[in-house]
Amino acid sequence: MIARTLRTVGRQGRNLLLPRITACRPLHAIPANFSKAYDHDGKTKVTIFNTETDLGLMVTGYSQYGFRLNNDMVLIGPISVFPRSVLSWNVNSFEDINEDSLSLFPTLEPKIDVLIIGIGDQAPPPALSKRIIEFMKKYKINVEILRTEQACATFNFLNAENRMVACALIPPLHLSYNENDILQAKLRKKELYETE
């Protein structure tokens, strides 16, 4: 009896609300590659991108000395990261970025859609941005010039979407720490010096 009353009230409530929803944005269909996220026995699976090596290389960490990738490889110095490979990049700072240091990217096959350049911890100078964009425009390659932290995140996102992307990264000179970083360091130190 109570269940029947609740169903009736629920139907009437929905009917009252439906006419009011007039301008609704359509939802996009779920891509085919997410069809594995729901198992038919009611279980939902979660995939953390930067631990999945099937999605290609991703930058999971950086320091003043270099970068850590999702396959646990640690690289020292500036690097060029591609979806399936990584190379050392022969620049010391953003002042060294010129047509010669970028000459690798237009010659790649298959052609990349986007080149992301992480220039350390400083904001990109307008003169550098203009020079790089004009050079890459000749080869019809889009360029994003960002701080290294933002460049790593952008590369990981585009790589997870299976875009043809490359990333050139210079390690930052200064790192910014947040409360979580300090807490993690304290916990690691406690585990290291903990004796039984």
Curated annotation (Swiss-Prot):
It comes from the Eukaryota. CDD domains: Mth938_2P1-like (cd05125). One of its GO terms (cellular component) is mitochondrion. Pfam families: DUF498. Residues 1-93 form a transit peptide. Involved in the assembly of mitochondrial NADH:ubiquinone oxidoreductase complex (complex I). Together with NdufAF4, involved in biogenesis of complex 1 modules N, Q and P-peripheral, but not the P-distal module. Required for recruitment of the complex I assembly factor Timmdc1 to complex 1 assembly intermediates. PANTHER family: NADH DEHYDROGENASE [UBIQUINONE] 1 ALPHA SUBCOMPLEX ASSEMBLY FACTOR 3, NUCLEAR PROTEIN E3-3. Together with NdufAF4 associates with mitochondrial complex I assembly intermediates during its biogenesis. This is NADH dehydrogenase [ubiquinone] 1 alpha subcomplex assembly factor 3. It comes from Drosophila melanogaster (Fruit fly). The gene is NdufAF3.
